[in-house]
């Protein structure tokens, strides 16, 4: 009787993902994004990021100025005085914290600035102020926590920022999560990619030449009520506006693929997300069409953001003066408003590519009714 011999099956080994080296321009954009991400610039105290952006745009624009609110404007004039005025914006500020009490032994009370989930605060390292004083959000270790407390979310008003005995921290100082920027190959990880990614994209847009009067506005205080955008939109008097921001990606590790999220549908690697409408804006249909047709003609991947929650500076800009046709384009990002967000490098590059192409092909037909 013949005996059967077992044949060993070879285990399949995963092929390494090929990462295309960035071009020189892309490498410059990533380096700028790193600087922007690692700066401390919480709403109302955007000076550190504004300084970086100003240095980056001074040689790219015909005019650079800062208004009383702190908005930074960089203007590229068109050849014709009759050219349409197009406002393109990204916000400088990030969510974070404000020190509100000068405590003893380096322990300071603090409040959230912008939308932050209390669940993610415990034990997180922070940077305080432009000097990035190192601290940590203190909490009771598990040894001291009662069993019935372990399933309870600790509220922010019972936490402290601990900076040791450093006396240079004072009430009013801003703080952010202490997250270094990291290149992950196909993606990047960092804090405040909402909306430092948009700021880096807008700097890249300023490198182009367009048949429009381009008004680039780097706005302040978006995370606390679109306050800078209200002023910027009024000052610019644009014929149209494009807002560049970040939107929550829904392709999360904990998300059931079979469940449709009622507010967000974007995915990393699928291109910039064009808004139809959100909580604050119904995007102008003509601008949606122009962006989508531009993407298709230039073979730039894009996605339509599912109508629903959230909002951008467009919510304030479209209501200024007699009204401004507006649309938002966002870079999708995972884990926004947390210590570390994740963003596809291709989505980042393609957002700049799409808006540049849309501006280059601008004509009177874009806003024709």
Task: State the predicted function of each range.
Residues 1-369:
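N-terminal hydrophobic/helix-forming segments and targeting peptides
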């Amino acid at each position: 009787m013949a005996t059967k011999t077992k044949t060993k099956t070879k285990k399949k080994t995963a092929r390494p993902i090929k990462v295309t080296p960035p071009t020189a321009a892309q490498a410059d954009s990533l380096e700028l994004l790193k600087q922007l991400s690692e700066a401390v610039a919480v709403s109302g105290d955007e000076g550190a990021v504004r300084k970086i952006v100003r240095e980056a745009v001074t040689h790219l624009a015909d005019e650079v100025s800062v208004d009383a609110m702190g908005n930074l404007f960089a203007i590229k004039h068109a050849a014709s005085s009759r050219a349409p005025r197009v406002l393109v914006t990204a916000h400088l500020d990030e969510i974070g914290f404000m020190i509100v009490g000068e405590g003893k032994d380096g322990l300071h009370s603090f409040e959230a600035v912008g939308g932050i989930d209390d669940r993610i605060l415990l034990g997180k390292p922070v940077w305080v102020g432009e000097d990035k004083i190192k601290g940590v959000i203190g909490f009771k270790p598990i040894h001291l926590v009662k069993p019935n407390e372990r399933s309870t979310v600790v509220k922010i008003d019972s936490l402290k920022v601990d900076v040791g005995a450093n006396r240079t921290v004072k009430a009013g100082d801003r703080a952010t999560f202490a997250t270094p920027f990291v290149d992950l190959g196909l993606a990047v990880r960092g804090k405040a990619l909402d909306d430092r990614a948009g700021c880096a994209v807008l700097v890249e847009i300023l490198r182009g030449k367009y048949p429009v009067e381009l008004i680039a506005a780097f706005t302040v205080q978006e995370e606390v009520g679109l306050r800078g955008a209200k002023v910027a939109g009024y000052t610019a008097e644009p014929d149209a506006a494009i807002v560049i921001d970040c939107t929550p990606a829904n392709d999360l590790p904990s998300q059931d693929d079979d469940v449709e999220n009622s507010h967000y549908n974007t995915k990393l690697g699928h291109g910039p997300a064009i808004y139809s409408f959100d909580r604050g804006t119904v995007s102008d249909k003509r601008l949606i069409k122009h962006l989508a047709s531009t993407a298709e003609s230039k073979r730039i991947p894009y996605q339509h953001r599912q109508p629903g929650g959230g909002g951008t500076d467009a919510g304030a800009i479209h209501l200024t003066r007699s009204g401004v046709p507006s649309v938002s384009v966002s870079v999708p990002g995972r884990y926004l408003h947390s210590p570390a967000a994740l963003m596809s490098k291709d989505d980042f590059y393609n957002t700049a590519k799409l808006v540049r192409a849309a501006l280059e092909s601008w004509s009177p037909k874009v806003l024709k009714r």
